[in-house]
């Protein structure tokens, strides 16, 4: 069944929260469901589940024609008229990974795919989970050392995006 949404601040146009608790949302076209203690400042973020996420920035969108339904009810709640119509609106190109927790996404079109990940800068994606071995320049390979110095104990901090079979382009940044 539905869990009531409680203790939320939702401001802006077209923002919705379903079964959410203690979220703060400001912007346009955001849609959160099943989330707890998330902060979203930006536009067109869609996220299902998760908790303790901080999102600052807007997602990339595209214009799409979507079908909606207008429903008129009488005082008793009985449907007396239902009419389908189409409208063109901005929709996000993608949704965030479901059930992500403790993530930080700062910048336009950023995303985190693993719990605890951090994505900083436009189009950055944090996709590497904890447990990944760091690169050892002395061997030109991932380190075999399993200490916390070489093996991550938390998800990655990303300032770019690696190319994957389903994505277009690599994004790199210089850290100075």
Residue ranges with predicted function:
Residues 1-176:
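Glycine- and small/polar-enriched repetitive beta-structure motifs of secreted/surface proteins
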């Amino acid at each position: 069944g539905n869990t009531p949404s409680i203790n939320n601040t939702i401001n802006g146009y077209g923002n919705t929260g379903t079964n959410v608790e203690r979220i703060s949302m400001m912007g346009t076209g955001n849609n959160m469901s099943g989330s707890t203690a998330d902060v979203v400042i930006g536009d067109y973020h869609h996220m299902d589940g998760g908790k303790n996420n901080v999102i600052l920035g807007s997602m990339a969108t595209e214009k799409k024609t979507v079908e909606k339904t207008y429903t008129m009810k009488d005082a008793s709640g009985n449907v007396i008229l239902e009419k389908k119509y189409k409208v063109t609106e901005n929709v996000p190109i993608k949704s965030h990974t479901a059930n992500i927790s403790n993530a930080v996404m700062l910048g336009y079109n950023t995303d985190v795919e693993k719990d605890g990940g951090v994505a900083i800068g436009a189009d950055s994606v944090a996709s590497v989970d904890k447990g990944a071995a760091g690169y050892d320049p002395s061997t030109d390979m991932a380190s075999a050392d399993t200490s916390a110095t070489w093996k991550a104990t938390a998800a990655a901090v990303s300032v770019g995006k690696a190319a994957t079979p389903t994505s277009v382009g690599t994004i790199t940044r210089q850290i100075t």
